[in-house]
C-alpha cells in the first residue's frame, strides 16, 4: 500500500511542498534566496518496510541534533515515544534540550522505518521551515528510492 502510494506520485503535483511562484522568483526568473541542498542522507535501514516522508528540515540554527525532525519544539519523537513505549520522554534529553539520536536510530532500524523528505533542494522564501515558505528546486526521486526498498509495504 505505501509503495503504491509513493509510486502514484509520479507526475503528480506535491501537495504539501509546492513549487512556489513568488515575486522574488520572478525577478529575471531567479530567486534572490540561496538554494539549500538536503543536509541528510536518506535513513534507509536494512529491511526498511515503511518510508516516512517529510518536506525539508528546518534551518540548522533550529536543530537539537543532526537527524530528521531535529527541532526540539517538534513533537515527532515525543509522539513516537508515547505511541510505542507509553513514554513521551523516551527519546528526549530534557537537560540538553535535545533528542537521543542513538536510541532513535536503533528504534527506527528495529521497526524497519526509513526517513527522508520530498525535496532534495529548496529555497526558503521566508526564514521558516513551513511548507508554504519553501520553493522546491529539486524534488526527491521517490520512484528511484522505492525501487531500492524491496520490502516496502
Task: Identify the residue ranges that each predicted region occupies.
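A polyanion-binding, active-site-adjacent surface
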Residues: 28-153
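Polybasic, lysine-enriched low-complexity intrinsically disordered terminal tails
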Residues: 15-25
Amino acid at each position: 500500500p505505501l509503495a503504491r502510494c509513493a509510486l502514484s506520485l509520479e507526475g503528480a503535483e506535491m501537495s504539501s511542498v509546492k513549487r512556489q511562484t513568488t515575486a522574488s522568483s520572478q525577478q529575471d526568473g531567479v530567486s534572490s534566496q540561496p538554494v539549500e541542498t538536503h543536509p541528510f542522507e536518506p535513513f534507509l535501514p536494512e529491511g526498511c518496510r515503511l518510508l516516512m516522508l517529510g518536506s525539508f528540515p528546518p534551518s540548522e540554527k533550529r536543530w537539537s541534533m543532526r537527524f530528521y525532525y531535529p527541532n526540539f519544539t517538534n513533537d515527532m519523537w515525543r509522539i513516537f515515544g508515547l505511541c510505542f513505549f507509553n513514554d513521551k520522554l523516551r527519546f528526549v534529553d530534557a537537560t540538553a534540550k535535545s533528542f537521543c539520536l542513538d536510541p532513535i536510530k536503533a528504534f527506527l532500524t528495529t521497526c524497519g522505518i526509513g526517513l527522508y523528505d520530498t525535496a532534495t533542494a529548496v529555497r526558503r522564501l521566508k526564514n521558516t521551515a513551513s511548507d508554504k515558505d519553501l520553493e522546491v528546486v529539486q524534488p526527491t526521486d521517490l520512484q528511484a528510492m522505492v525501487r531500492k526498498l524491496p520490502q516496502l509495504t
